Amino acid sequence: MQWQDHAIILGIKRHGETSVIAEVMTRDRGRHLGLVRSGRSRAMQPVLQPGNAVEVIWRARLDEHLGEFRVEPVTLRAARLMETATAVYGVQAMGALLRLLPERDPHPHLFDALEVILDHLHNPADAGELFVRFELAVLNDLGFGLDLGECAATGARSDLAYVSPKSGRAVSRSAGAPWADKMLLLPPFLGVEGNHAADFDSLAAAFRLTGFFLHRHVYEPRGMEAAAARDGFVQAALKALNPALRTLAGPNGVSA
């Protein structure tokens, strides 16, 4: 068995004295593990860092075996990703999200999105918005997609201001007004118009939105918590937009 694919390094685990088991996100074969011989060598260590883009050749006698990777560098961005808190936490948080998906399950759109986000992690506003959209895409692929295109009550596609915590569907401002205190806010940049840039308030609302549904549909049923890196990323992204922010609280909430 053999195949070749574009991949992004998610992490590594030591294996024996000189080798590692690499975890990568491939474009056409999903999240995949493989043994890299001499992966702890001086030549390979800089290549096998999270966030780097590589070309991998996987070989195994049988498809169900772990197999071995031969890894060639393509874009070594790991050093740059260590320069900001949003980048450090962002790489870890996206890896944790991808681990929610079955191994070897293809998600090419998530691979493409991951590459885009990795190249924008230096800009907190861009990184925050892209990360929220990434979380929405993961929710969708897990079978818990949100319907943000029209009002659940009226079918209207304009002035959408809320999301029902029960149905995960958008609600217009007028239809949701009587229950506004029980609704989740729909950030303007996630609306159908999509012509609003993310600012501090809308990004904080977006993190609450995705955090709520990830906790409800994924983490709680699996008896797990969100990765600490997500909280770190949320804090770093929002603090970059509002340096006066001191604390972030709760799995789904933000407090100043």
Curated annotation (Swiss-Prot):
GO terms for cellular component: bacterial nucleoid. GO terms for biological process: DNA recombination; double-strand break repair. Keywords: DNA damage, DNA recombination, DNA repair. It holds the Pfam family RecO_N. SUPFAM superfamilies: ArfGap/RecO-like zinc finger (SSF57863), Nucleic acid-binding proteins (SSF50249). Belongs to the RecO family. HAMAP family: RecO. Involved in DNA repair and RecF pathway recombination. This is DNA repair protein RecO.
